[in-house]
């Protein structure tokens, strides 16, 4: 998504990070008296994408800073994207204000990939990443063994790429 925002929408300053990275950066900036630079770094972006927002629960100072950052960007019409294991309203410790801001957009539960979609993604990623063609029969054997989300499929494509480069076949 971050790459698409950069390419299609010509957004140069797209910030994509985990909630843990945001928290660590915030804590570090407070300790080093760099809160102004922190705020500038996060509030002057074209788009903000934060993964694993469930990590934010019960971190009061970080939640407050995240809320102010979200409000600043939302009022400027900047795209915001949050991902997490739960809906914002279900994250323990997340303030109602921030959960409400997150839920004011589109909240979409992500289901595990079905076998056909997983196969299509695997084929595409292997075609994009691997120097050599991978036989369809091998993909037929691998695909049913995969479970979970796109990260698992990406890992398999990376493994095939690495093995091809190591062994040249």
Give the predicted meaning of each segment.
Residues 7-8, 25-50, 56-72, 125-128:
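Conserved alpha-helical scaffold flanking the Walker A/P-loop in AAA+ ATPase domains
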Residues 16-17, 49-51, 79-86, 109:
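Structural recognition of the conserved hydrophobic beta-strand(s) that form the central parallel beta-sheet
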Residues 90-92, 105-117:
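Conserved AAA+ ATPase "SRH/arginine-finger" region at the nucleotide-binding site
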Residues 68-69, 73-96:
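Sensor-1/coupling segment of RecA-like P-loop NTPase cores
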Residues 86, 105, 117-132, 159-163:
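Conserved AAA+ ATPase "sensor/coupling" helix adjacent to the nucleotide-binding pocket
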Residues 123-127, 137-145, 151-166:
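C-terminal helical "lid" of AAA+/P-loop NTPase domains
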Residues 1-15:
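Walker A/P-loop
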Residues 27-31, 88-104:
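Short regulatory helix/loop adjacent to the ATP-binding pocket of P-loop NTPases
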């Amino acid at each position: 998504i971050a790459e698409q925002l950069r390419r299609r929408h010509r957004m140069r300053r797209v910030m994509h990070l985990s909630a843990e990275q945001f928290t660590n950066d915030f804590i570090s900036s407070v300790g080093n008296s760099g809160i102004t630079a922190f705020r500038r770094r996060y509030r002057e972006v074209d788009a903000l994408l934060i993964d694993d927002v469930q990590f934010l629960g019960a971190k009061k100072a970080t939640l407050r800073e995240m809320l102010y950052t979200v409000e600043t960007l939302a009022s400027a019409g900047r795209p915001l994207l949050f991902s997490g294991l739960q809906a914002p309203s279900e994250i323990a410790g997340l303030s109602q204000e921030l959960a409400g801001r997150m839920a004011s957009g589109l909240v979409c539960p992500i289901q595990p990939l079905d076998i056909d979609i997983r196969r299509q993604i695997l084929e595409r990623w292997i075609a994009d990443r691997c120097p050599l063609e991978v036989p369809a029969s091998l993909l037929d054997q691998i695909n049913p063994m995969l479970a979970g989300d796109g990260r698992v499929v990406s890992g398999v494509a990376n493994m095939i790429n690495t093995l091809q480069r190591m062994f040249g076949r």
